[in-house]
Amino acid sequence: MKPLTPRQQQVFDLIKSKIDDTGMPPTRAEIARELGFRSANAAEEHLKALARKQAIEIIPGASRGIRILLEDAANDEQGLPLIGQVAAGEPILAQEHVEAHYQVDPAMFKPQADFLLRVNGESMKDIGIMDGDLLAVHKTQDVRDGQVVVARVDDDVTVKRLERKGSTVLLHAENEEFAPIQVDLTSQHLTIEGLAVGIIRNTDWM
């Protein structure tokens, strides 16, 4: 079976949840309403994609004609972990930070991605990293000036472009409305959590 995209995983999880709760799968209209699709036709396209990947079977002529083939997909902890709120002093990949696992092939990114981080805010929008995107991150501290990194400054995690100047590090936004973050390494703690290697956009979750 091919890995599910994040959006396909959401649809699959909703189907399984409805079956577990009510004994019946959702209609296309219910899927569209709960996941914010513009129409039932959009939900149908996601169902067809799941069927092509052999996660479900579509039964023709029935509004609730959906049968799950891949029972363990919703709980499968393969794929990339999505990191949520990061607690102070804890490793970024600590289990309590993992919100979900998405069926994304890590090898589609170069270098290979190790985790996903949800983007909050518009500080990097000028290079196409938008609010709500999932940022694919290769976990490494081996980064160069000019690269986009995930950095932890004291207890705050941020995505910025790196510049080193002696005992000072500048973390640059890609939006003129945001000033650089200046880190004094003599008095502040900086950890490079990883290198940005790609994005998954909400509109691409098909």
Swiss-Prot record:
Its EC number is 3.4.21.88. The record marks A88, G89 as: Cleavage. Keywords: Autocatalytic cleavage, DNA damage, DNA repair, DNA replication, DNA-binding, Hydrolase, Repressor, SOS response, Transcription, Transcription regulation. Residues 28-48 bind DNA. It is an enzyme of class 3 (hydrolase). GO terms for molecular function: DNA binding; serine-type endopeptidase activity. The active site is at S123, K160. It catalyses: Hydrolysis of Ala-|-Gly bond in repressor LexA. Disulfide bonds: none annotated. The keyword ATP-binding does not apply. It holds the Pfam family LexA_DNA_bind. GO terms for biological process: DNA repair; DNA replication; negative regulation of DNA-templated transcription; proteolysis; SOS response. Belongs to the peptidase S24 family. Homodimer. Represses a number of genes involved in the response to DNA damage (SOS response), including recA and lexA. In the presence of single-stranded DNA, RecA interacts with LexA causing an autocatalytic cleavage which disrupts the DNA-binding part of LexA, leading to derepression of the SOS regulon and eventually DNA repair. HAMAP family: LexA (MF_00015). NCBIfam families: lexA. This is LexA repressor. It comes from Vibrio parahaemolyticus serotype O3:K6 (strain RIMD 2210633).
